[in-house]
Amino acid sequence: MAVPKKRTSISKKRIRKNIWKRKGYWAALKALSLGKSLSTGNSKGFFVRQTNKS
């Protein structure tokens, strides 16, 4: 099994963790934006089937 030779520095670990967190933040922001556009009816990327409840 592969074992790292040296310990990763705290700063490098923090940088990698922040990059990982930033990816999640942008994914959540994009999902929220898409949800907003779908709810207001401004989405142009795809079609949503409208259901008639009455």
UniProtKB/Swiss-Prot annotation:
GO cellular component, one term: large ribosomal subunit
Keyword Ribosomal protein (UniProt): yes
Pfam families xref list: Ribosomal_L32p
Keywords per UniProt: Chloroplast, Plastid, Ribonucleoprotein, Ribosomal protein
Single GO MF descriptor: structural constituent of ribosome
Domain of life: Eukaryota
Location(s), subcellular: Plastid, Chloroplast
Gene Ontology terms describing biological process: translation
InterPro entries assigned: Ribosomal_bL32, Ribosomal_bL32_plant/cyanobact, Ribosomal_zn-bd
Entry's family note: Belongs to the bacterial ribosomal protein bL32 family.
PANTHER family linked to this entry: 50S RIBOSOMAL PROTEIN L32, CHLOROPLASTIC, LARGE RIBOSOMAL SUBUNIT PROTEIN BL32C
Stated name of the protein: Large ribosomal subunit protein bL32c
Source species of the chain: Panax ginseng
Underlying gene: rpl32
